[in-house]
C-alpha cells in the first residue's frame, strides 16, 4: 500500500508538470521591433466637475505640442478618447490619449527640442505655466501604459 501511495504522488506530480508546460512556454509578451511604431496609452482622471476644464486646458496647452511631434515625425498619431459609460470611482478614468511614436526609442527619451517648441507655441510663458499648473491641480490621477499590438498580420 505504501508503494502505491508513493507511485500515485509521482504520477500526480508528473501530470502537473506536463499540464503546466504550456504556461511555462508562454514567456513574456511580444515586444515591437526597434524600428516599429510604439504605442503608449496615457490615462487622466480629473476631479469631479472639472473634466471639461481639464480637457480644454489639455487641448490648448498640450495637444499643439503633440501635433508638432507629428509634423517632425517623432509621433505617428494621437487619439483622444473618453469612456461611453460610467465606472466605479476606483476604476474611473476621464480621458485616454493614445500616442503612437515612430519607435520605442523616441517614446522613452526626452525630446531635446521640447523647450524650444514650447516657447514657440506659447510665447506668453507666464500664462502657459499658470494654465499648466491649473491642469495638474485638477488632476487626481495619471498613468501611462505602453501597449503592444498583437493583431495577426494578414
What are these regions, as identified by a protein language model?
Residues 1-7:
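N-terminal secretory signal peptides that target proteins for export/translocation
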Residues 4, 14, 72-75:
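Conserved long hydrophobic alpha-helices within structured protein cores
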Residues 8, 36-40, 93-95:
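Residues at beta-strand starts and edge strands
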Residues 9-22:
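Bacterial N-terminal signal peptides
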Residues 27-29, 33, 68-76, 90-92, ...:
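An amphipathic, aromatic/His-enriched active-site/gating alpha helix that lines ligand/cofactor pockets
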Residues 34-49:
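Acidic/histidine-rich, surface-exposed loop or edge segments in extracytoplasmic proteins
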Residues 50-77:
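Short amphipathic alpha-helical segments
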Residues 81-86:
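A cross-kingdom feature marking solvent-exposed beta-strand/loop segments within repeated
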Amino acid at each position: 500500500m505504501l508503494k502505491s501511495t508513493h507511485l500515485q504522488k509521482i504520477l500526480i506530480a508528473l501530470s502537473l508538470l506536463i499540464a503546466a508546460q504550456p504556461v511555462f512556454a508562454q514567456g513574456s509578451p511580444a515586444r515591437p521591433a526597434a524600428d516599429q511604431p510604439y504605442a503608449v496609452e496615457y490615462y487622466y482622471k480629473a476631479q469631479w466637475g472639472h473634466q471639461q476644464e481639464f480637457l480644454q486646458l489639455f487641448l490648448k496647452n498640450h495637444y499643439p505640442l503633440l501635433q508638432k511631434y507629428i509634423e517632425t515625425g517623432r509621433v505617428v498619431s494621437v487619439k483622444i478618447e473618453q469612456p461611453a459609460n460610467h465606472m466605479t470611482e476606483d476604476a474611473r478614468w476621464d480621458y485616454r490619449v493614445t500616442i503612437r511614436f515612430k519607435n520605442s526609442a523616441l517614446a522613452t527619451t526626452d525630446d531635446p527640442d521640447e523647450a524650444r517648441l514650447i516657447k514657440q507655441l506659447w510665447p506668453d510663458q507666464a500664462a502657459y505655466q499658470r494654465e499648466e499648473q491649473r491642469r495638474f491641480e485638477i488632476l487626481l490621477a495619471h498613468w501611462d501604459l505602453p501597449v503592444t499590438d498583437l493583431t495577426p498580420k494578414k
